[in-house]
């Protein structure tokens, strides 16, 4: 009998833990949750206190049987899943499904996979925390209710196959609202005035000192007036202020700050960060990666202090304790940090090394001294103007934590850090000569679109979601195609520059590319329509405060302050009638439909909406005698901004370009974009070609290329058996026959195969598949023997087929 069985949720974690425990311990993995709510059913008994109906998925049944057998043979079962709510729920499900006995079961938790942490956990077991289990169960059931009840409403009112989620819908709303802010944004111009002054340096050489007018000028006239004044002006230093500044390091990483910084510094997606962090944790290299705590243990603080002192000296050491700001921080009780602070580098994949380096530096920096900076501000008066120029300089007196780490910022976060530069020696009352003064037209910028990192930060600010939900939320909204992560090309813009050199002012216009964006989250038309529909009919679900308050209630359940069923009852009592009323309500038009105007040719209504395969333009209505005409909206267009003229252009397709081989060549638009069609052959139009301007010659070239590709695909046909064909596929040549595919062995030349040889291959492979389906789960020795015979027979038949083909 096995003395001890330890069950964790991942095989990698099991492998690491097994190293630390002796021969009396066996470590197995549950591979995550072993049961869940039924996939295709509601699985919640609302009338019986929201009792959930769980099932063991088919792919987990064999594993559960194995775990049961192992648990029955063990004296003690140690449930060692993660220490957050999901981990506690996994432990509870294992306890229930494996029918474990309380006297033989121990629950252990640890936030790092080190020998010391594991042994300490075994010395200090606890019971399963049912409050944490209830909090996880409440979230799971509430999200199932929202998803199962809202989805049919969307199918009926918007478009089939749509789905909605509680946190995901709020994330989409943030992205939709930001997009509308951008479209509504009115750019304002102003003039930024900069001057280059010539100043003697310590060694007597003349150096340049850049200065900027204290505030921007609104118009070109104001800018020109100032430059005119500067022609005859004298410039004097009216004030010099020098003040010491201290820069303090950021706190160690939480889940969200790690996701944000990894995106900025390493270019990782949120999901990628979590995947790599999971591997580091399971390898025993970092602490648990789902946490909203910034706290470090005394052990970690002392280890950091020792590492800093050894590497940089005692002056760089400054012990700090950071307070966790997140209310109800409930995941793990320590920040993300290396398990061994003395290990500045690790082995592993490039991604693992990069992320570990980021975590190590951030943790070390958090326990280092402030950076000491001296900032100097120089005010330069203009003799005949009230305006002043300002020059700033910064000298780092002691680099402190900056020696190791500098925090990055999103493009929508303004930082107060000036460009660090050293000013020459200056004194109050000193006269200055300028080399040139420039007034450059600048424009206000619209709010930037969200990146994955900035969306996580916004969700955290609003109190929506928790460390375990950020990555799945962002992945889900992209998988459902409510949001896409894409690029926006910049636009050319003209700006004006006035330049004073000596006594002459030049006036020139320049061009620049502005507004280019990469890896930004943008709503799709479907995402916008679903968002607007949910806001109209289910305002609570989309309300930021409501969603945040639900998260707080989950925290209260976890702390044992609230009953999970009471919270669900309150929610369902209001939510369910809204669903019923919305399903029953009759609306004048389909959700998301936008009427653009009237078609001048037919006099019928022109509108855009979300169709079965995406956004479409429509001429006419269902009430008209003639059926409405539809045209697919181009990918670069939006039903929010498309004009009547642009919509009417879409109906110019299909258009006939001319003839090729006696048949019409037609350009049209379909579900997957524009295409060329001729005599049953279809060729996709490349993105570089416009369907409205493509020529007959260009179309014929595309058709010829498609014909060549098709010819290479079709290797051989047989007149006497038209249903059988030899084709060239992605994984090599194969036989297609009566709706099924049959692989051709590698040692056979497909072109040499006769019809008889093909049919023999089909028969042998069909017989083999039939034999497979008849086999039981337990493979006996006789079955294995018969398999060998079949494989030999197949080889013999294919050899025979080849020789038959060659004889012909």
Show the residue positions of the predicted features:
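Metal- or metallocofactor-binding catalytic centers and their adjacent structured scaffolds
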Residues: 218-253, 427-432, 438-440, 545, ...
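Short acidic, hydrophobic short linear motifs in intrinsically disordered regions
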Residues: 237-241, 248-262, 287-291, 446-458, ...
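C-terminal or mid-to-C-terminal helical accessory/interaction module adjacent to the motor/catalytic core
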Residues: 113-197, 242-246
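Short, polar/flexible loop-turn hinges at active-site or ligand-entry regions and domain interfaces
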Residues: 53, 81-83, 100-106, 125-133, ...
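A conserved hydrophobic secondary-structure block that centers on an alpha-helix together
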Residues: 259-261, 265-272
């Amino acid at each position: 009998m096995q003395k001890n069985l330890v069950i964790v949720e991942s095989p990698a974690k099991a492998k690491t833990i097994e190293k630390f425990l002796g021969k009396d311990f066996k470590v197995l993995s549950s591979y995550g949750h072993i049961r869940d709510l039924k996939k295709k059913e509601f699985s919640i008994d609302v009338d019986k206190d929201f009792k959930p109906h769980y099932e063991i998925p088919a792919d987990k049944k064999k594993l559960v049987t194995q775990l049961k057998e192992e648990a029955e043979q063990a004296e003690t079962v140690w449930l060692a899943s993660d220490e957050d709510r999901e981990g506690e729920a996994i432990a509870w499900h294992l306890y229930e499904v494996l029918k474990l006995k309380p006297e033989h079961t121990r629950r252990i938790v640890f936030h790092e996979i080190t020998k010391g942490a594991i042994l300490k956990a075994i010395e200090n077991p606890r019971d399963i925390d049912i409050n944490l289990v209830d909090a996880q169960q409440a979230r799971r059931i509430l999200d199932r209710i929202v998803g199962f009840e809202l989805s049919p409403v969307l199918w009926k009112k918007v478009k089939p196959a749509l789905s909605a989620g509680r946190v995901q819908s709020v994330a989409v709303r943030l992205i939709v609202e930001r997009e509308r802010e951008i479209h509504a944004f009115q750019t304002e111009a102003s003039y930024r005035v900069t001057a280059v002054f010539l100043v003697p340096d310590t060694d007597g050489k003349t150096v340049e000192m850049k200065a900027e007018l204290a505030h921007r000028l609104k118009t070109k006239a104001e800018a020109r007036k100032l430059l005119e004044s500067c022609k005859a002006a004298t410039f004097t230093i009216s004030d010099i202020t020098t003040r010491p500044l201290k820069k303090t390091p950021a706190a160690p990483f939480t889940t969200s700050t790690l996701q944000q910084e990894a995106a900025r510094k390493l270019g990782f997606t949120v999901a990628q960060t979590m995947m790599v962090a999971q591997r580091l944790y399971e390898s025993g290299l970092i602490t648990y990666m789902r946490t909203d705590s910034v706290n470090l243990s005394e052990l970690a603080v002392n280890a950091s202090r020792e590492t800093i002192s050894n590497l940089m000296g005692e002056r760089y050491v400054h012990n700090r304790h950071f307070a966790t700001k997140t209310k109800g921080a409930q995941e793990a009780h320590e920040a993300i940090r290396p398990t061994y602070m003395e290990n500045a580098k690790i082995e592993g994949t490039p991604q693992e090394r990069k992320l570990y380096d980021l975590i190590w530096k951030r943790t070390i920096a958090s326990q280092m001294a402030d950076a000491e900076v001296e900032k100097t501000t120089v005010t330069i008066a203009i003799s005949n103007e009230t305006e002043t120029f300002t020059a700033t300089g910064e000298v780092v007196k002691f680099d402190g934590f900056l020696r190791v780490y500098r925090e990055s910022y999103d493009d929508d976060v303004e930082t107060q850090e000036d460009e660090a530069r050293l000013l020459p020696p200056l004194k109050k009352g000193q006269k200055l000569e300028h080399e040139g003064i420039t007034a450059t037209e600048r424009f206000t910028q619209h709010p930037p679109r969200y990146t994955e990192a900035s969306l996580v930060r916004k969700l955290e600010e609003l109190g929506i979601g928790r460390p375990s939900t950020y990555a799945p939320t962002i992945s889900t909204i992209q998988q459902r195609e409510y949001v896409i992560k894409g690029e926006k090309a910049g636009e050319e813009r003209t700006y004006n520059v006035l330049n004073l050199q000596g006594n002459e002012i030049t006036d020139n216009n320049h061009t620049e590319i502005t507004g280019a964006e990469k890896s930004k989250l943008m709503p799709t038309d479907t995402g916008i329509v679903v968002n607007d529909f949910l806001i109209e009919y289910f305002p609570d679900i989309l309300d930021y405060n409501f969603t945040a308050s639900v998260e707080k209630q989950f925290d209260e359940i976890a702390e044992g302050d609230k009953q999970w069923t009471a919270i669900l009852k309150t929610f369902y009592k209001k939510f369910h009638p809204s669903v019923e009323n919305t399903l029953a309500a009759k609306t004048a038009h389909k959700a998301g439909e936008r009427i653009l105007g009237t078609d001048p040719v037919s006099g019928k209504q022109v509108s855009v909406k979300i169709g079965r395969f995406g956004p479409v333009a429509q001429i006419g209505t269902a009430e008209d005698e003639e059926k409405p005409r539809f045209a697919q909206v181009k990918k670069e267009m939006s039903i929010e901004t498309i004009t009547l003229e642009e919509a009417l252009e879409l109906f110019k397709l299909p258009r006939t370009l001319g003839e090729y081989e006696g048949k019409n060549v037609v350009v049209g638009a379909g579900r997957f974009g524009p295409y060329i069609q001729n005599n049953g052959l279809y060729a996709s139009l490349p993105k570089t070609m416009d369907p409205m301007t493509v020529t007959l010659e260009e179309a014929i070239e595309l058709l010829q290329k498609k014909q060549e590709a098709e010819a290479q695909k079709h290797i051989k046909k047989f007149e006497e058996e038209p249903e059988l064909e030899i084709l060239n596929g992605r994984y090599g040549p194969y036989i297609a026959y009566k709706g099924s595919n049959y692989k051709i062995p590698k040692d056979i030349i497909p072109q040499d195969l006769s019809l008889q040889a093909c049919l023999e291959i089909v028969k042998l492979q069909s017989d083999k598949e039939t034999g497979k389906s008849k086999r039981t789960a337990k493979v006996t020795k006789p079955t294995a023997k018969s398999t060998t015979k079949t494989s030999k027979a197949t080889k013999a038949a294919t050899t025979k087929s080849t020789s038959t083909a060659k004889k012909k």
